[in-house]
Amino acid sequence: MKYSEIMVRHGELSTKGKNRMRFINRLKANIQDVLSAYSEVTVRSTRDRTHVLLNGADDRSVIEALKPVFGIQGLSPVYKVEKSVPVLIAAVQEIMSSLYREGLTFKISSKRSDHQFELDSRDLNHTLGAAVFEALPHIKAQMKNPDVTLKVEIRDEAAYLSHEDIKGAGGLPVGASGKGMLMLSGGIDSPVAGYLSLKRGVEIEAVHFASPPYTSPGALRKAKDLTQRLTRFGGNIQFIEVPFTEIQEEIKHKAPEAYLMTLTRRFMLRITDAIREKRKALVIINGESLGQVASQTLESMQAINAVTSTPIIRPVVAMDKLEIIDIAQQIDTFDISIQPFEDCCTIFAPDRPKTNPKLANVERYESRFDVDGLVERAVAGIRVTEITPEIETDSLSTLIEELL
């Protein structure tokens, strides 16, 4: 027998009261995005669960695509059959025969929402259990912790059988908590910050600053590859490339070296905030970790934050570097992040950056620039690309094609 669908159990959605269907519909849309490469698959949702109808698609590939999606508590591949006793007996015998090995223990666990069905749950357990013994005389029944629990559910439209419970990613459906702008460099920390925000239902748009010719096409490709990794958790992500060369050259020529990083980060924050307002997001997200680098001391954060009143979420702020690396490895972004392409935060990095910048000094140096004009030109020059969770191609080949 082939699985007919994957039954998705909702996670924290069950606690969301009147907003429950909004959350469920968001999860459905995210699942459709994640499975966009499987044209034959269809998705439908009810208040209790979401049904991913395979229609011939490979069940294992679909399950692997669904496992990282936030908002899913668990998955069960399911056989859908006609709800008649003879059909159920034949299906149960076939399933258990395919699973059987010497010493295997099992139990049948039936329930019915269709109370017009000819057998109640207890009688159905006995009837189907007897059918298993008829097909497999040496198999053993065990009510507590059996090797296989074959679940049989009688619903109005059909009967459903399953024996696998696969843990989902939990969390909230991406987008259920609103939208935020993720300041995505090419490093280890910002993709992890994006992942943790996605887990709590925040839809992210990735803002990446590019400074050609100082930053290479490889650095841009790396940022897009990191973004694609993040699409596995909730579907498509808008990637926003910001032209930053003019601003970095201005800062390099007009400001003291020790203040380069502080001024650079202030411009980045202004630009991200302007894009946030334009694209109707609620917060800014970054990968700052307290004390990790010069721009991430409390004094530096205060001087940089002064340019905006927008809330800034820092999901990794209290984590050690090794904790962040562990998550990066789990979500498969680490190997991309350590590719040796410099981003615009490192190309002009001073040897001795100011770790305790005074706001009065920062504002005095900033008065040398046409701040509003620089920000407006950067925002006007953004390029937006939709990154999708399609089946991945070789990134090296893609990069070579772009260079040619």
From Swiss-Prot:
Pathway: Cofactor biosynthesis; thiamine diphosphate biosynthesis. CDD domains: PPase_ThiI, THUMP_ThiI. It is found in: Cytoplasm. It catalyses: [ThiI sulfur-carrier protein]-S-sulfanyl-L-cysteine + a uridine in tRNA + 2 reduced [2Fe-2S]-[ferredoxin] + ATP + H(+) = [ThiI sulfur-carrier protein]-L-cysteine + a 4-thiouridine in tRNA + 2 oxidized [2Fe-2S]-[ferredoxin] + AMP + diphosphate; [ThiS sulfur-carrier protein]-C-terminal Gly-Gly-AMP + S-sulfanyl-L-cysteinyl-[cysteine desulfurase] + AH2 = [ThiS sulfur-carrier protein]-C-terminal-Gly-aminoethanethioate + L-cysteinyl-[cysteine desulfurase] + A + AMP + 2 H(+). One of its GO terms (biological process) is thiamine biosynthetic process. Residues 60-165 form the THUMP domain. It comes from the Bacteria. Pfam families: ThiI, ThiI_fer, THUMP. GO terms for molecular function: ATP binding; CCA tRNA nucleotidyltransferase activity; tRNA binding; tRNA-uracil-4 sulfurtransferase activity. The keyword Cell inner membrane does not apply. Catalyzes the ATP-dependent transfer of a sulfur to tRNA to produce 4-thiouridine in position 8 of tRNAs, which functions as a near-UV photosensor. Also catalyzes the transfer of sulfur to the sulfur carrier protein ThiS, forming ThiS-thiocarboxylate. This is a step in the synthesis of thiazole, in the thiamine biosynthesis pathway. The sulfur is donated as persulfide by IscS. Belongs to the ThiI family. NCBIfam families: tRNA uracil 4-sulfurtransferase ThiI. This is Probable tRNA sulfurtransferase. It comes from Streptococcus equi subsp. equi (strain 4047).
